[in-house]
Amino acid sequence: MTKLATTGLSLIRLLGYLTVTAAALPLQALSLACGWRGVSRQLPRLYHRLVCRVLGLRVAVYGRVSTARPTLFVSNHASYIDIEVLGALITGSFVAKSEVKSWPVFGLLAQLQRTVFVERRMRSSTAQQRDSLAGRLQDGDSLILFPEGTSNDGNRLRPFKSALFSAAEIRIDGHALAVQPVTVAYVRLNGTPIGRHMRPYFAWYGDMALADHLWNLAGLGVTEIMVEFHEPVTVEALGSRKRLAEHCENVIADALARANSGRGIEAPVVDAAAVAA
């Protein structure tokens, strides 16, 4: 990657990020300890919105967020920034691989947002994954799932793992669970389209060092991110969780390809400044 980040901006933004995080951590811990369910559900969304502002992330939203509660949101995954963006738009908890729980700072943040940690490497854990997710969904909590199982380079999707859709087979109060595909795409930096050569500034994958990546990202200007909420579906309508996974993968892949090619989105903008820098 060529050097685009500025040291001064990186320093200011990361200090802002640390300040917001230091303020939010004890408040969220207190709300969980005291059983303030409404606060513990809404505070993470406020936190993520503030982080987006601090880091210069401007989000344009297309489509409408599912109003069914709970909803299982499924999204492509290119970066830890996806969590800030989706967390700012959706009241819910994330589903993450178990290793995240032990990460410094980010592991604590994930636990305080009541993230559901799953072991994705063991085939025998499918039933346990379903039970863990089903329990939270039955309790009324919407969940945000990255069915690729890991982050990618932001240019294309990895195959979706149908086993991760097992929780979609449960019924909530006698009704099929709503599953909403969501596409996240990093489209412009300071008004300039983000091409393949610039996407590594935003996508975090493989063996990239987290600290270096975050420092560089914080030093960039205003990043425009497109989030498209597609039409919710159910496993019953599609016949099986495998077909559900294929449907979500195809819908998200098509939208990501359009966004990355600069062809834009056909749906009208619902909130072009849902998270403004």
Outline where the language-model segments fall:
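Cytosolic-facing loops and C-terminal tails of multi-pass membrane proteins
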Residues: 242, 247-277
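Catalytic core of membrane glycerolipid acyltransferases/transacylases, capturing the structured
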Residues: 24-39, 45, 52-54, 69-123, ...
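Soluble extracytoplasmic domains of inner/organellar membrane proteins
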Residues: 126, 133-134, 141-160
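A cross-family acyltransferase "interaction/gating" segment
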Residues: 106-107, 154-239, 262, 266
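N-terminal membrane-anchoring alpha-helices
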Residues: 1-60, 259, 273-277
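Short histidine/acidic/glycine/proline-rich micro-motifs that form metal-
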Residues: 34-35, 123-124, 150-153, 234-235
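Membrane-proximal, non-transmembrane interface segments of integral membrane proteins
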Residues: 70-71, 129-132
